[in-house]
């Protein structure tokens, strides 16, 4: 019975691959036009626990005060000093949510609902431009954010997913995930509301409406945002901008990620 169940599961996912590969050709994604740009956006970057997790500061430097570092009210004084130093050095702004992460035993939890909470609070309380880029602290895009937002504006869309690209080098477990991401990105041509936490964009007012209704459940956060946006009738598109992410490179880290994704 177990063998049959496994075979059914494997055949199901192979079917999904075939379906996405065939039907995605019938759908158009939005291509970037270097002549169409927009500066009317803010970048929300959640950062908490340790400033060392902010790995894309150099990448974000050109965007200056459009970058908002979103953190909690439960960090250490050393953390706040270091974050302030970074903000001054790069010209970023800081938004401090009233949220204080709970403690588990002697350790403070730095996952769970923290990321979505500080982003939601920034959307509701911080002064922001007309469009929003939600960006993880270790994520970079291969194309300028001005072009990506320009594509959203030109297509009169409310929010958008982008193409996520894992690292090229790595063992078999990484190469397997590269194929997985290729298939997943094809599916986003059909279902552009399948957002990724690494980077997604939208109108500020629209993202406020979405996050105000969000459950803040961490493992389903990005997909939930897209589902809410779609249910509210907002227009989603998939933009062919390439965003770098690091996929787990060991079987253990991959397994932990999949267990987390399963909820």
Feature names for model-found ranges:
Residues 218-225:
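Acidic donor-binding loop at a coil-to-helix junction in glycosyltransferase catalytic cores
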Residues 1-37, 189:
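N-terminal membrane-anchoring/stem segments of glycan-assembly enzymes
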Residues 129-140:
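Short beta-strand-to-loop acidic/aromatic patch adjacent to the donor-nucleotide binding site
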Residues 226-244:
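Catalytic donor-sugar/metal-binding loop of nucleotide-sugar-dependent glycosyltransferases
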Residues 105-114, 118, 143, 149-218, ...:
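Long helical/loop segments within the catalytic core of UDP-sugar-dependent glycosyltransferases
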Residues 239-255:
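Active-site donor/metal-binding and catalytic loop motifs
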Residues 79-83, 87-125:
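Active-site-proximal specificity loops/subdomain of glycosyltransferases
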């Amino acid at each position: 019975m177990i063998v049959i169940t496994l075979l059914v599961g494997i055949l199901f996912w192979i079917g999904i691959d075939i379906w996405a590969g065939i039907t995605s050709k019938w759908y158009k994604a939005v291509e970037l036009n270097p002549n169409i740009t927009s500066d009317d956006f803010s970048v929300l970057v959640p950062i908490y626990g340790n400033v060392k997790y902010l790995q894309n500061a150099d990448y974000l430097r050109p965007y200056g005060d459009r970058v908002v570092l979103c953190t909690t009210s439960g960090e250490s004084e050393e953390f706040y000093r270091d974050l302030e130093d970074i903000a001054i050095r790069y010209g970023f702004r800081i938004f401090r949510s009233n949220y204080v992460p709970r403690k588990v035993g002697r350790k403070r939890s730095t996952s769970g609902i923290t990321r979505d909470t500080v982003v939601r609070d920034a959307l509701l309380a911080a002064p922001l431009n007309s469009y929003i880029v939600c960006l993880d602290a270790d994520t970079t895009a291969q194309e300028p954010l001005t072009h990506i937002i320009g594509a959203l504006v030109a297509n009169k869309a409310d929010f958008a997913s982008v193409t996520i690209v894992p690292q090229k080098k790595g063992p078999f477990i990484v190469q397997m995930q590269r194929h997985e991401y290729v298939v997943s990105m094809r599916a986003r041509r059909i279902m552009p509301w399948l957002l990724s936490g690494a980077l997604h964009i939208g109108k500020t007012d629209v993202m406020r409406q979405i996050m105000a209704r969000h459950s803040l459940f961490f493992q389903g956060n990005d997909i939930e945002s897209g589902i809410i946006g779609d249910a509210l009738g907002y227009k989603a598109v998939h933009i062919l901008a390439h965003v770098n992410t690091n996929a787990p490179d060991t079987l253990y880290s991959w397994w932990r990620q999949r267990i987390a994704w399963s909820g």
